[in-house]
């Protein structure tokens, strides 16, 4: 009788320990996944801010730079493409992020061409509204870089958790999948050639 009671208590303690570990590990993975989704939301938020600044920037430039209609149209169409691509936070795969990043990169390149063309219009560069929009755009680009970095850090922490043993067993059972990362743009590892 005493031996049976001891065995039952030992089994109950072991079962409780396993249950506690499963619960703790599962909840940790859920928290990690929610942190990744939150970080992704912030990335989308700052990209949306940039997209929202573009119509005002285009309208300001249009008033001064009538000969830049091709550049303005490329910015408008790049903005349209960039805002059409959405990524489901539950499916943050490397391919989905690469597609999103590509569309946003096109928009960034078009904006860069627009800002370069402005150099030919000194009265536009002196316009207070344009200077304010340019400053806001610069600040937004900095925020984008920061939020992308935070997203990558959060995704890396989550991916490490779900790939580590023995949590990877539970991740597989409960369907937790790795999240993709933002990657450096092609050619970013090569320094630009500067000649004087």
Give the location of each predicted region.
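A helix-centric hydrophobic-segment signal that preferentially recognizes long
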Residues: 1-196
């Amino acid at each position: 009788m005493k031996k049976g009671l001891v065995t039952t208590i030992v089994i109950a303690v072991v079962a409780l320990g396993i249950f506690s570990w499963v619960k703790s590990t599962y909840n940790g993975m859920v928290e990690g996944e929610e942190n990744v989704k939150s970080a992704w939301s912030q990335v989308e938020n700052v990209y949306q801010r940039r997209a929202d600044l573009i119509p005002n920037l285009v309208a300001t430039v249009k008033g001064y730079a009538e000969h830049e209609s091709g550049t303005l149209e490329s910015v408008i169409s790049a903005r349209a493409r960039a805002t059409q691509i959405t990524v489901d936070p539950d499916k943050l795969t490397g391919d989905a992020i690469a597609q999103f990043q590509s569309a946003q990169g096109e928009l960034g390149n078009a904006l860069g061409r627009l800002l370069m063309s402005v150099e030919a219009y000194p009265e536009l560069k002196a316009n207070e509204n344009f200077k304010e929009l340019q400053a806001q755009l610069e600040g937004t680009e900095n925020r984008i870089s920061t939020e992308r970095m935070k997203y990558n850090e959060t995704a890396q922490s989550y991916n490490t958790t779900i790939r580590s043993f023995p949590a990877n067993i539970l991740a597989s059972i409960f369907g937790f999948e790795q999240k993709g990362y933002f990657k450096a743009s092609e050619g970013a590892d090569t320094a630009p050639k500067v000649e004087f």
